[in-house]
Amino acid sequence: MKKENQKVRLATFIETHQKEILIEWDSFAKTLFSGVDKFHISLLRDHAREILIELVSEMEQKESPQQQKAKSLGAPSPAHPAESAANVHGLLRYHDGLSFTSLAAEFRALRASVLRLWLPNIPVITKQVLLDVVRFNEAIDEALADSIATYETR
């Protein structure tokens, strides 16, 4: 991956590097299933792409200091969709027979992959970089919570 402009925001990076991120997601997801067919992998990728799009949307939402504080205490984002791609993902993982632990591991792997791919392009850690990481973590945590909630109701 080539070096990006040092001012590249994390949400922009996710949008422009979806292919690399999805390859990482696919590699990890394949370790969770034995004998996964190509159709199933394409379904996995579709939901992963939708989750990435929702993460970016969440990260780009303007937030007041009060909204930031409320989110840090577990309140959902005001812009959060009632039925998210992460909800669907949790349901599909339940029907696939994936364990609760494996579901959580997917989001852990997604978080690590995105940050591992993005951070080498950031020569200096600035306040904005840290804020981007916080927003990303909040968005990932909210997506994980959606997946878990749907998984648990089954």
Where are these regions (language model features)?
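N-terminal accessory segment detector
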Residues: 1-39, 46, 50
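Amphipathic alpha-helical segments in well-ordered regions
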Residues: 28, 47-58, 62, 113-117, ...
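Hydrophobic transmembrane alpha-helices and their membrane-interface boundaries in multi-pass
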Residues: 24, 34-91
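Long, amphipathic alpha-helical coupling/dimerization segments that relay conformational signals between
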Residues: 2-15, 23, 71-154
